[in-house]
């Protein structure tokens, strides 16, 4: 029996900054979508971004996690993969060239996400005149629409400041955000 699967699911619009012809940045909509590792087109898009973003190990880690979900080694209910894309329609045919960033996380309990990996397309990080800006913040804003609590372990250095700027607070080695400003409860990461 052949299993029928559908492609990425649109979750919400997200606001990014897009470079205008006059070299200023204007607010623009992007789409935040949940990828489906069981869908071959979604997997191809994830495979391609890990190739295009070859020096960014998080893109490879996200793709490898999707492979494990696809092979039923990990639960698709627990392990989630989302992308931010400039694509606005036809999410059953994800255009990997329009992916602005990707995030993979674990739903540890209802409305609680632990972010394992968040990667913005490197061409929008390392270049001062990039076509798109605010991609990482748009990903976090979108996750905040769908989860009441979010936790992660940041890299040392500037990523900690990035998460603080986006409303996260430091709790030991972790960063935590809560919609209701709750204190984090210890959650088993297994």
Predicted regions and their residues:
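Non-catalytic substrate-recognition and accessory regions of acyl/acetyltransferase enzymes
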Residues: 2-130, 138-190
């Amino acid at each position: 029996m052949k299993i029928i699967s559908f492609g990425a699911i649109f979750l919400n619009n997200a606001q990014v900054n897009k470079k205008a012809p006059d070299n200023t940045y204007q607010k623009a909509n992007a789409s935040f979508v949940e990828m489906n590792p069981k869908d071959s087109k979604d997997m191809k898009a994830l495979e391609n971004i890990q190739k295009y973003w070859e020096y960014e190990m998080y893109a490879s880690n996200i793709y490898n996690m999707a492979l494990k979900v696809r092979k039923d080694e990990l639960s698709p209910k627990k392990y989630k993969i989302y992308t931010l894309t400039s694509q606005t329609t036809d999410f059953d045919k994800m255009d990997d060239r329009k992916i602005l960033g990707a995030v993979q996380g674990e739903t540890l309990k209802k409305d609680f996400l632990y972010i394992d990996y968040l990667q913005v397309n490197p061409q929008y990080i390392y270049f001062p005149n990039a076509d798109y800006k605010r991609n990482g913040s748009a990903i976090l804003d979108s996750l905040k629409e769908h989860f009441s609590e979010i936790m992660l372990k940041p890299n040392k250095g500037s990523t900690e400041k990035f998460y603080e700027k986006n409303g996260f607070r430091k709790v030991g080695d972790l960063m935590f955000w809560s919609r209701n400003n709750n204190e984090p409860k210890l959650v088993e990461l297994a």
